[in-house]
Amino acid sequence: MKALAKLKKQPGIWIINDAPIPEYGYNDVLIKIKKTAICGTDLHIYNWDKWSQNTIPVPMITGHEFAGEVVAKGDGVTSVDIGDRVSGEGHLVCGQCRNCRAGKRHLCRKTIGIGVNVQGAFAEYLVMPAVNVFKIPDSISDDIASTFDPMGNAIHTALSFNLTGEDVLITGAGPIGLMAVKIARFCGARRIVITDINEYRLQMARDFGATVALNVAPFKNQDELVKQMRKVMSDIGMTEGFDVGLEMSGINSAISMMLDVMNHGGKLSLLGISAGDISVDWGAILFKGLTLKGIYGREMFETWYLMTSMLQAGMDMNPIITHRLHIDEFQKGFEIMKSGQCGKVILDWSS
């Protein structure tokens, strides 16, 4: 079968045409891949950064955002049928630890990821445990279903706290941050402010319903950044700090600024992963009585049902997809992702 694989311990990704079709077991499902989306994690693997060098076994078929069709299943599988349109949870968990047994599988300490630790979805076929498979309703396209993984991250982050009538600050306008704008607006947030240094994506955020999308690139230091943010807050009628903060960037200055402008009793969801150590004003957290929640992946499977219901209720995520390419143009897709001048990039696996 055709696949995209990390074949060498150096930057790049390579297409192969003779990868074996994976074998499925008693409780597994064999999925024919129709669409995949390129994730920031895939870009890290492509660039072969320090995290990738320490994490990714080579060779490895990568990718974990997908939509496809069930073409075979093990004898023990009763939850899906051949012909079903599906996506799937890319985090594989042990099922036996305290958190798994308590229904909190997203907190399994033995989690491994498809396309990271085991064969991924950038291939014509993928094997996945049936318990990880999620049926796609007829009303949701394959393109949108292939973005369920990052959309689930956005849903989990944004809906960890009530957004209705609240003032929301989002730091980081990558695809997940942009999805969070849509989610916050759909859920009735009062004001939504988002920050980034990428003007292309900030304009997308404005189009998605952000009250203000602030380019923070011009500000030379933390004091200037906070001063400008307070001006923005005043200009849009805010008399107190932000009620909810959604941290998507992993950037120290963004986190410090967020702590500075949160209201007393504010709540923060932290999804962004830093490349290094982060220093924070512990006093701001204590004296403001802030609540912080770390986010990793999606709640299995409450997040999946939530995003499906919201899409069916009219939340339009189609504009997050800015580029659609055939798999043979994968190199172009990665170059577009590297440029940052895009939302989600979809790869079509049809022949």
From Swiss-Prot:
Q: Which Pfam family is an annotated match for this chain, by its short name? A: ADH_N
Q: Report the main location listed first in the record.
A: cytoplasm
Q: At which positions is NAD(+) bound?
A: I176, D196, R201, L271, G272, I273, I295, Y296
Q: Which UniProt keywords apply?
A: Cytoplasm, Metal-binding, NAD, Oxidoreductase, Zinc
Which residues are catalytic?
T41, H44
One biological process term from GO is:
L-threonine catabolic process to glycine
Entry superkingdom: Bacteria
In alphabetical order, the GO MF annotations are: L-threonine 3-dehydrogenase activity; zinc ion binding
Localization per Swiss-Prot or TrEMBL: Cytoplasm
Query: What are the residue positions of the site described as Important for catalytic activity for the proton relay mechanism but does not participate directly in the coordination of zinc atom?
Result: D149
Needed cofactors: Zn(2+)
Give the pathway listed in the UniProt entry for this protein: Amino-acid degradation; L-threonine degradation via oxydo-reductase pathway; glycine from L-threonine: step 1/2
Catalytic activity reads: L-threonine + NAD(+) = (2S)-2-amino-3-oxobutanoate + NADH + H(+)
Q: Name one GO cellular component term.
A: cytoplasm
The UniProt record lists the EC number as 1.1.1.103
How does the cofactor bind to this protein, according to its record? Binds 2 Zn(2+) ions per subunit.
Residues bound to Zn(2+) 1: C39, H64, E65
Family under the similarity heading: Belongs to the zinc-containing alcohol dehydrogenase family.
Function text: Catalyzes the NAD(+)-dependent oxidation of L-threonine to 2-amino-3-ketobutyrate.
Complex formation: Homotetramer.
Protein's name in the database: L-threonine 3-dehydrogenase
Organism, by scientific name, is Francisella tularensis subsp. tularensis (strain SCHU S4 / Schu 4)
Gene name for this UniProt entry: tdh
